[in-house]
Amino acid sequence: MQRIRCLLALFALEATGFAGPASAVAQNPADDWRPRTLPLYGVSYSPEVGLLLGAGLVHTRYAFRALPPSTRLTAAAAYATGARTYRITLAGEFRRPLAPATVAVDLYASGLEIVRYYGLGNATVASGPDSVYQVRQTQFAIAPTLSVPLAARLRLAAGVMVKHARTHADSGTLLFAAGPAYGSGFGAAGVRTLLELDTRDHPTAATSGLHLVIAAQWYPALWDAVRPFGSLSAEAATYASTGDPPRATLALRAGLAGVSGTVPFHELVYIGGGTTVRGYPEQRFAGRSGAYANAELRLRVGWLSVGDVGVLGLADAGRVWGEDDASRRWHAAGGGGLWFALRHRRASTVSVTWARGTEHPALYVRVGFMF
């Protein structure tokens, strides 16, 4: 669950997403349909990752006076000062005029997917120094996908995933002592599918709507996978607000996931950190299945000339299940924070949150909200 999301979000200067030309057609109708290239930039912070700085470019091209765009190309790179590693992503989306399907190709090289390993189970301890639990792993992946709309705001996507992970054998770490059966490198190729319903009014700072994602992956016994393995996950988030523009927003989210087969350690279900249960280290708990829930109450308390100012309260909980795991404990955390929307634009929202679990408090800074 944690691996499919990144704390770093990227802004496009003067535009976010597929920038449509409708607002300026009357002034410059010819210019609005020309190809455009915009810079991207982003920043976030979490304890184990550190300061994550990112930049990139997004190029958008339209067919003859047709929306949505026919081509969108994105290139981005980020570096984490705490984890001392990087993530590079290349993505392309391609559409033919009047055709409903979208072809996407995603490539990435990343050392940020897995940064900690505390062992398998819901009751693992973290009494040693932090260096014992650190993981240095670089993942390389390519994933072509075909996406088809089933209804308004509902899409089905399917494709293949080719992935290789290289793990450094750092002596003195818990992972080195456990000794992954496959050694330092693991390659696999499989298929994946995703069903997504998205009625949110904004992707990173929603105030209304529903977001539901159900995803599955399966890898046959090919390459370094001696036996088949797979995963299934589901996540749902909903939002309710009062006022126009919204003065208060209640955001709720729940998710669960499970794996089967002979799974490499980096494909386990992980709970903890800035994308699942805040107030715990990244990948604090690992298991063959897991669940989490989050709640945030976001209040707008100030309307300044430069933007909106707000506060929020949060509560998170989650757990994993391992083999013969007798623990019944749910790991919970609570906290709060501030948020600011520059120029009253939700696309320019930055949030700063503080959360405390049972081990130590943690500070998070990100573009938008966690969900």
Predicted regions and their residues:
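Extracellular loop and loop/strand-boundary signature of outer-membrane beta-barrel proteins
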Residues: 76-78, 127-132, 176-182, 218-224, ...
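Outer-membrane beta-barrel translocator/channel fold
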Residues: 78-90, 96-142, 255-274, 348-354, ...
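Outer-membrane beta-barrel "beta-signal"
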Residues: 192-195, 336-340, 345, 360-371
